[in-house]
Amino acid sequence: LIAATLVAAMGVSLLTGCGVSNKSHDNTQVGTTENSSDKAKNKEVKMHVWCSKDDVDITTQMIESFKEANKGTDFNIIIEESEDSDARNNILSNVHNGADVFPIADDQITSMVAGGALYEIEDVDAVKKADDEGAVEAATIDGKLYGYPLTADNGYFMYYNKNYFSDSDVATLDGMLDIAGANGKYLTMDWSSGWYLYSFFGNTGLDFGVNDDGVTNHCNWNAIITDIKGVDIAQAMLDIAAKPGFKNCVQDDFIAGVQDGSIIAGVSGCWNAAKIKELWGDDYGAVKLPTYTCAGQQIQMSSFKGYKYMAVNAY
């Protein structure tokens, strides 16, 4: 219960700072601490909190504020760096020794609920009142809420260096790759991740999604009777990969390339915005994903609208 109360407090703090909520929090109390703190007075309350490296400072501040608001309870809260993307594997592989409180992305919730790893949020009405409807819906399974919304920006787009690209240049992937290649530079994307590869399939009429059981999924990306076929997309990707201006790399390598000047554009998300803006300065640019050539057509690349949450270990 104490862990859930901490998460509620952290969720409200982050929402206020990150702008996820579309409603005022001035008169909303999510997860009041009165009862849980009274029971815990004069006892040591131990908690283990995970957060990403970039969020250590703000997480520490929120925990200190939580302690201040609950004087009389002896808190022993340990903060450990752990990337959001690793939460599912880390928790499900050792749920009893995992963190009590941790951040997760919306695409991890279904499997973690199926594994019995997430604590059901009790103050649902307060969360619905305070937060974005889409964020609440994405963390709700069978009418039960399993996370406090933190952000609504878990998607990706195109970063580009304005010293090389004009506003019109970034409309097509072909054009951007030609410019990168002509300058001996690279445009990058992580093709090792299905999350990013979705961008080539999302606007083609092909389909994938979660089945009614909430665990298994369906996918027809190998369809041969649709206007755009799976083999068409595969060929388009082969053509992209063959261009001198393209480089397949993970996010850390993307940032390293921006730093050394070899990368002048790349697909990533808001988590890299501050660093890229620092490096490119006035030449910093960001825009929706471009179109790409597939089966002789220009297809608009897709992205995800995703959310992040603070969740509580059910154990």
Q: What is the role of each PLM region?
A:
Residues 3-4, 12, 16-108, 287, ...:
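Conserved N-terminal structural module of periplasmic/extracytoplasmic solute-binding proteins
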Residues 92-93, 97-100, 128-160, 185-189, ...:
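A structural signal for short loop-to-beta-strand junctions that line the ligand-binding cleft
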Residues 108-113, 270-283:
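A ligand-binding cleft/hinge motif common to bilobed small-molecule-binding domains
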Residues 216-250:
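Glycine-centered hinge/linker elements that transmit conformational signals in sensory
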Residues 76, 278-315:
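Extracytoplasmic/periplasmic substrate-recognition and gating elements
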Residues 80-90, 107, 247-260, 271:
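Short helix-initiation/N-cap motifs at beta->coil->alpha
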Residues 106-156, 168, 174, 285-289:
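Hinge/lid segment of periplasmic solute-binding proteins
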Residues 146-150, 156, 177-222, 263:
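Extracytoplasmic/periplasmic solute-binding protein
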